[in-house]
Amino acid sequence: MTTFEIECIESTREGLRDHYSKFCLEPLNQGQGTTLGNALRRTLLADLEGTAIVAVRIAGVSHEFSTIPGIREDVLEILLNLKEVVLKSQIGTSGVGRLRVQGPAIVTTNHLELPSEIELIDPNQYIATICGNNILEMEFRIETGKGYNLVERDSDESSIDFLQVDAIFMPVKKVNYLSKDIRSENNLIQEQLTLEVWTNGSIDPQDAVSQAGKILTELLFPLKEINFKPDDSESIIEDSKINQILIEELQLSVRAYNCLKRAQIHSVADLLDYSQEDLIEIKNFGQKSAEEVIDALQKRLGINLPKEKTSKSN
């Protein structure tokens, strides 16, 4: 089995909300580069948890197409700005934040009052501009999730003046990968995987790749030891075939065979209705014939008749 190494060959930060790293994974067997690259890309984009504002209640506002006196932006623009706010939850739970600013002022994320367990990544993100002495007051809900959460228009939150936001939980903004052939020291053709990861600053690309690897490992671990349950249908078919076997196949003595026939026992299925005690009580059968039948069933078909007497009478 090939053991590969991973190395971060480039890492930059162009801002508080734009982290980038480039990784190299090698050596891989042929075909593994695309397999691993695609799995990591999907996991990085879809399965990592992030934190975002999901709903906002603004004082004096009833719907997202409203305007607020003294505020340069309309409500829809404010919601779009709040959608871009990057947060990080230390314990992965939801919370409630607030904002109250009196103008004139330029409102940024630095004005947000957040729960202690939630961290603001960029305090300079723009939210709105207040003209004059007007007040912008709002309350917003913060949640942790995965992927992209579309607004549910019929949610109960609309009844209490909360305006929902299309929340972007994804801490990873973009992933690229490239697989190419390389030659080993033994002149074997192997593969090198290059992985590029961009994040929003709430997580380092290195940590993101590490989390993605852990998620994939936990996902695939059950496949390491697979214990398939037997197919019940196959067992039923096998039992059906055995039950259809005629008593002629048991190669019994003439006496035992004739006694069974007179008792209307023509197949193994008929015999299974009897216990060992029931066989002895068949007319003219006796202990010796019963033992012969019991022995034939056990040796030829692996069937053991119960010893106790059943309710069947002959």
Swiss-Prot record:
One of its GO terms (cellular component) is mitochondrion. Keywords: Chloroplast, DNA-directed RNA polymerase, Nucleotidyltransferase, Plastid, Transcription, Transferase. It holds the Pfam family RNA_pol_A_CTD. Residues 1-227 are annotated as: Alpha N-terminal domain (alpha-NTD). The keyword Membrane does not apply. GO terms for biological process: DNA-templated transcription. It is found in: Plastid, Chloroplast. InterPro entries: DNA-dir_RNA_pol_insert, DNA-dir_RNA_pol_RpoA/D/Rpb3, DNA-dir_RpoA, RBP11-like, RNAP_asu_C, RNApol_insert_sf. Its main location: plastid. It catalyses: RNA(n) + a ribonucleoside 5'-triphosphate = RNA(n+1) + diphosphate. One of its GO terms (molecular function) is DNA-directed RNA polymerase activity. Residues 237-314 are annotated as: Alpha C-terminal domain (alpha-CTD). Its EC number is 2.7.7.6. Belongs to the RNA polymerase alpha chain family. The N-terminal domain is essential for RNAP assembly and basal transcription, whereas the C-terminal domain is involved in interaction with transcriptional regulators and with upstream promoter elements. In plastids the minimal PEP RNA polymerase catalytic core is composed of four subunits: alpha, beta, beta', and beta''. When a (nuclear-encoded) sigma factor is associated with the core the holoenzyme is formed, which can initiate transcription. DNA-dependent RNA polymerase catalyzes the transcription of DNA into RNA using the four ribonucleoside triphosphates as substrates. This is DNA-directed RNA polymerase subunit alpha. It comes from Pyrenomonas salina. The gene is rpoA.
